[in-house]
Swiss-Prot record:
Belongs to the class II aldolase/RraA-like family. GO terms for molecular function: 4-hydroxy-4-methyl-2-oxoglutarate aldolase activity; metal ion binding; oxaloacetate decarboxylase activity; ribonuclease inhibitor activity. Pfam families: RraA-like. Substrate binds at residues 75-78, 97. Divalent metal cation. PANTHER family: 4-HYDROXY-4-METHYL-2-OXOGLUTARATE ALDOLASE 3-RELATED. Catalyzes the aldol cleavage of 4-hydroxy-4-methyl-2-oxoglutarate (HMG) into 2 molecules of pyruvate. Also contains a secondary oxaloacetate (OAA) decarboxylase activity due to the common pyruvate enolate transition state formed following C-C bond cleavage in the retro-aldol and decarboxylation reactions. The lineage of its organism: Bacteria, Pseudomonadati, Pseudomonadota, Gammaproteobacteria, Vibrionales. InterPro entries: RraA, RraA/RraA-like, RraA/RraA-like_sf. This is Putative 4-hydroxy-4-methyl-2-oxoglutarate aldolase. A divalent metal cation binds at residue 98. Disulfide bonds: none annotated.
Amino acid sequence: MKDITPDICDQHEDKVTLLNLPLQNFGQKAAFFGEIVTVRCYHDNSKVRDVLSENGKGKVLVVDGHGSCQKALLGDQLAILAIENDWEGVIVFGAVRDVAQMSQMELGIKALGTSPFKTEKRGAGEVNVTLTMHNQMVQPKDYIYADWNGILISKELLQF
């Protein structure tokens, strides 16, 4: 594993902002980056499944679950789907489950916490909308870089 965010900060400090959320690592791939795709949902991961069913080459899904850890928005089945569709990673402002299995998967996964409970499946949620989490904006088509050191956002793809 390679640390990427310190190098990015050293080379591009004026082009990045820190996404200052207390997220934990759950996937085997600890360092990952890509173009941001967003989902906003609450206790319903239908849109997460829809998005992860698409080609995710070079992309990271950022899910705003409103910070709730009552129901998991990502589990092992959706993580497998993400891997099958070439996603770089999934960042969840909410809960995940099946963490023992996901810790063995070659996917970047960060989340606020865990819950053993599954979500509702009502088709609710919004895709590719601007998210605001802890007063910080996350916009689709921006770029996100994540590792053990933190999470950075940039308007452009950075070389490092």
